[in-house]
């Protein structure tokens, strides 16, 4: 069995992040926060989205997530599996469980542009060989009769040979004459029995 999974593209996401500006010293060039005490995101959400799309998921760290405080930080790799192709999944679903701090709201929607291609091939071969025995029917058992053995010396002396059986008188005094006639009589009986059974 061979299983191959082809992920043709990384998950793309569009983020709409709105936060209150808490410091006047903010970096507007890089689009990410300067330090833990500074909670600022550039108001240009489209530029931030392009910046996030240009990086691979392995290279994205806490500084790229637009929030360095533990209350609003999130991991893209751990939440990227919770996506729906038709509708994005809001990753800020636990806002109500957070303490009420004036940090604003952040929402990131994930969606796959291209699906995951899965190829699974299962190759198997089954060979079955059976030996069937043919059960003997009752008719076969009835037709098989045990005939008595014919002795070499028979009591009957009346054996007549035809002209076709005689070979210029050489067989008249043959010592196997009685065995021959006994065998011929037995073969006639077997032939008659076969004709009756049919």
Curated annotation (Swiss-Prot):
GO biological process, one term: viral genome replication
Location of the protein in the cell: Host cytoplasm
This protein's UniProt keywords: Glycoprotein, Host cytoplasm, Magnesium, Metal-binding, Nucleotide-binding, Phosphoprotein, RNA-binding
Main localisation: host cell
Annotated residues for binding of Mg(2+): 92
GO cellular component: host cell cytoplasm
Residue positions, PTM Phosphoserine: 67, 154, 156, 164, 166
GO molecular function: ATP hydrolysis activity; magnesium ion binding; nucleotide binding; RNA binding
Acidic residues: compositionally biased ranges: 153-166
Keyword Mitochondrion carried by entry: no
InterPro entries: Rotavirus_A/C_NSP5
Top-rank taxon, per record: Viruses
Post-translational modification: O-glycosylated. Hyperphosphorylated on serine residues, when in dimeric form. Phosphorylation by host CK1 is required for the hyperphosphorylation of NSP5 dimer.
Location of region: Disordered: 127-167
Cofactor: Mg(2+)
Entry keyword Mitochondrion: no
Reported function: Plays an essential role in the viral genome replication. Participates, together with NSP2, in the formation of viral factories (viroplasms), which are large inclusions in the host cytoplasm where replication intermediates are assembled and viral RNA replication takes place. Orchestrates the recruitment of viroplasmic proteins such as capsid proteins to these factories. Participates in the selective exclusion of host proteins from stress granules (SG) and P bodies (PB). Also participates in the sequestration of these remodeled organelles in viral factories.
Family membership: Belongs to the rotavirus NSP5 family.
Quaternary structure, from the entry: Homodimer. Interacts with VP1. Interacts with VP2. Interacts with NSP2; this interaction leads to up-regulation of NSP5 hyperphosphorylation and formation of virus factories. Interacts with NSP6. Participates in the selective exclusion of host proteins from stress granules (SG) and P bodies (PB). Also participates in the sequestration of these remodeled organelles in viral factories.
The protein, known as: Non-structural protein 5
Organism: Rotavirus A (isolate RVA/Cow/United States/VMRI/1988/G6P[5]) (RV-A)
């Amino acid at each position: 069995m061979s299983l191959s999974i082809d992920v043709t593209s990384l998950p793309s996401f569009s983020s709409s992040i709105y936060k209150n500006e808490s410091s006047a010293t903010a970096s507007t060039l890089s689009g990410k926060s300067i330090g833990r005490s500074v909670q600022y995101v550039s108001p240009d959400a489209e530029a931030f989205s392009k910046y996030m799309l240009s990086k691979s998921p392995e290279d994205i760290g806490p500084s790229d997530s637009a929030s360095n405080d533990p209350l609003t930080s999130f991991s893209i790799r751990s939440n990227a599996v919770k996506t729906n192709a038709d509708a994005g999944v809001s990753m800020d679903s636990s806002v109500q469980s957070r303490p009420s701090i004036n940090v604003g709201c952040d929402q990131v929607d994930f969606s796959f542009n291209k699906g995951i291609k899965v190829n699974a091939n299962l190759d198997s071969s089954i060979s079955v060989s059976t030996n069937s025995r043919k059960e003997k029917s009752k008719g076969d058992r009835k037709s098989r009769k045990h005939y008595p053995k014919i002795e070499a010396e028979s009591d009957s002396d009346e054996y007549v040979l035809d002209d076709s059986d005689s070979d210029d008188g050489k067989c008249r005094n043959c010592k196997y004459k009685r065995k021959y006639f006994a065998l011929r009589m037995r073969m006639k009986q077997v032939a008659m029995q076969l004709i009756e059974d049919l």
